[in-house]
Amino acid sequence: MASLDNFDMAAGRTDGVADCVAFPGRFSTWTRALILAASAAGGGAAALAMDAAHVALVLGLAAFAGGLLSTWSPCGYSSISLLRPTGKGARAVLDWLPTFATHGLGYALGALILGTLLGAIGGIAGLSGFATSFGLGLLAVIGLAYGAHQLDFLRVPYPQRRAQVPHDARQRFPKWVVGGLYGLSLGLDYLTYVQTPLLYLVTAAAVLSGNVAEAVALIAIFNLGRYLPVAVNLLPVTDYQIQSWLGRNQERAAIADGAILTAVGAAFAMLALA
């Protein structure tokens, strides 16, 4: 649940992202505790109807949700704002479609690179899949720990490169080129600050798979969730309306993040112990 209070939009530099030290009070401690308990109970109950074959489906859904929730990161706000069509009307939207396309291609390339690296690491380490007892146990710990982190009951290390894409690129290249560069930078997922620990869950699953194809697929699903929100620029809404809506729902996004992590962690814990 990081704040954007210290988010610097100055062009011509890579922006730093400071840690959050204060949290909005929209959700009381009791409310967050109830969400934590309900999520854990829901995940545990769901595990009763699951087997190893369902693990990949759950991870895929969690990856997509994580990608969507990463919109509430500094780069999520920025990519929607900075890659907007120039002008108004149907013609402006048509002229913007190449930017939208190259942005998606950048995300796809990022998924291919990162997924290949993670899958190869798992393969070299001799890991044989995320549905093993060890794999499920590790994913359960990550989900439960970072779920409590997002719900502000636990402080867990959050190692990331606290930086943003360099804004001066839009001064030097056509917008469709910038779209591709931003997509690649964001699609590598660890070059910029991503405000959802679901990325760690997906990363761990990709390594645990020990399989390049499965790892690429997981990262691609996460990146698809990151990419699609930019499509809001196809709609007749202003940048102010979009940014205001994101700002109003910042805390809700963090709560949803924590609930998903907790539910997935509880489900995988039950499967690991079965």
Curated annotation (Swiss-Prot):
<keyword id="KW-0472">Membrane</keyword>
<keyword id="KW-1003">Cell membrane</keyword>
<feature type="transmembrane region" description="Helical">
    <location>
        <begin position="253"/>
        <end position="273"/>
    </location>
</feature>
<comment type="pathway">
    <text>One-carbon metabolism; methylamine degradation.</text>
</comment>
<feature type="transmembrane region" description="Helical">
    <location>
        <begin position="176"/>
        <end position="196"/>
    </location>
</feature>
<protein>
    <recommendedName>
        <fullName>Methylamine utilization protein MauF</fullName>
    </recommendedName>
</protein>
<keyword id="KW-1133">Transmembrane helix</keyword>
<feature type="transmembrane region" description="Helical">
    <location>
        <begin position="30"/>
        <end position="50"/>
    </location>
</feature>
<feature type="transmembrane region" description="Helical">
    <location>
        <begin position="202"/>
        <end position="222"/>
    </location>
</feature>
<feature type="transmembrane region" description="Helical">
    <location>
        <begin position="105"/>
        <end position="125"/>
    </location>
</feature>
<dbReference type="GO" id="GO:0005886">
    <property type="term" value="C:plasma membrane"/>
</dbReference>
<feature type="transmembrane region" description="Helical">
    <location>
        <begin position="52"/>
        <end position="72"/>
    </location>
</feature>
<keyword id="KW-0812">Transmembrane</keyword>
<feature type="transmembrane region" description="Helical">
    <location>
        <begin position="127"/>
        <end position="147"/>
    </location>
</feature>
